């Protein structure tokens, strides 16, 4: 998720004025969307999953950003065979994490306006304890998205860093992958990982680093997940990074409903469009598309576990 809930989301009234994205042609081999937000997509989960499968995207990881959406993601994964979950407090939400949080979104009416119930704020320890409990579920494959976001000022950097360290500890205790949100914070993210000792499996979601950072991540064995912005005309530095990334350390994602890839940019994003990003990555890397799909699937199973 590139920021917080303030980012553009296609609401029902808006969607009627926006042409639905063109369905990609099916991939030659199955692959997955390693990072999406099904609770923010204005479609029923079964419909989203069916469209993804038609495009060759057979697995989806839906990601929590606060306690409420993490609960929702874990429950969604338990109810849908093609869906897995990640749970955490997004860096932009760390200062608000001890308040009531936003309500869960019903996939049948994900943007319904409902007043939150009056509840006593939780302590940071209570929030983290529930994140850890959720992370122990077999359908939860990662602790994330956590990390640092210095682009926005929704939470002070020192607060973000404290929560990031706590999430690293949880990922190591529960033996799950760590899914990182890193926006304009590369040096601090890498430093904190080194200071804390990284979990066995680390994923940089929506990778935004340059070629030197690719080399640092590759040396550490960190996985780099590329989103739809790699297809944008002004994203040549990101394509250079993707070209330099080892094929066995790459994943693809939508981060839906954000960052819709070309040729559907400006339309609602959804997991099916991971196929467009994979086609771009195959071209950038000079790889056969089927071979890249197989490599991404192998990396996903090594990172998140077999399915």
Language-model segments: which ranges?
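Mid-domain alpha/beta scaffold segments of enzyme catalytic cores
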Residues: 1-307
């Amino acid at each position: 998720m590139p920021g917080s809930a303030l980012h553009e989301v296609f609401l029902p009234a808006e969607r009627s004025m926006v042409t639905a994205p063109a369905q990609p042609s099916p991939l030659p081999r199955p692959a997955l969307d390693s990072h999406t937000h099904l609770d923010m997509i204005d479609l029923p989960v079964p419909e989203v999953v069916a469209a993804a499968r038609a495009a060759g995207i057979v697995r989806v990881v839906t990601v929590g950003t606060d306690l409420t959406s993490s609960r929702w993601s874990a429950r969604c994964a338990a109810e849908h065979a093609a869906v897995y979950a990640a749970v955490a407090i997004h860096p932009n939400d760390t200062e608000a994490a001890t308040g009531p949080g936003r309500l869960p979104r019903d996939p049948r009416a994900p943007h319904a306006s409902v007043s939150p119930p009056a509840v006593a704020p939780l302590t940071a320890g209570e929030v983290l304890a529930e994140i850890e409990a959720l992370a122990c579920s077999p359908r939860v494959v990662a602790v994330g998205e956590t990390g640092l976001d210095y682009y926005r000022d929704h939470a002070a950097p020192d607060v973000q860093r404290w929560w990031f360290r706590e999430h690293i500890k949880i990922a190591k205790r529960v033996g799950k992958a760590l899914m990182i949100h890193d926006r304009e914070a590369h040096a601090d993210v890498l430093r904190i990982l080194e200071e804390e000792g990284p979990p066995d499996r680390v994923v940089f979601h929506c990778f935004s680093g340059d070629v030197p950072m690719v080399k640092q991540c590759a040396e550490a064995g960190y996985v780099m997940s590329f989103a739809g912005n790699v297809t944008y005309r002004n994203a040549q530095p990101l394509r250079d990074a993707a070209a330099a990334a080892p094929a066995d350390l790459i994943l693809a994602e939508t981060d839906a409903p954000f960052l819709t890839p070309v040729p559907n940019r400006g339309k609602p994003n959804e997991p099916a469009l991971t196929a467009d990003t994979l086609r771009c990555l195959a071209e950038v890397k000079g790889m056969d598309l089927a071979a890249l799909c197989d490599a991404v699937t192998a990396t996903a199973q090594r990172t998140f576990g077999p399915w």
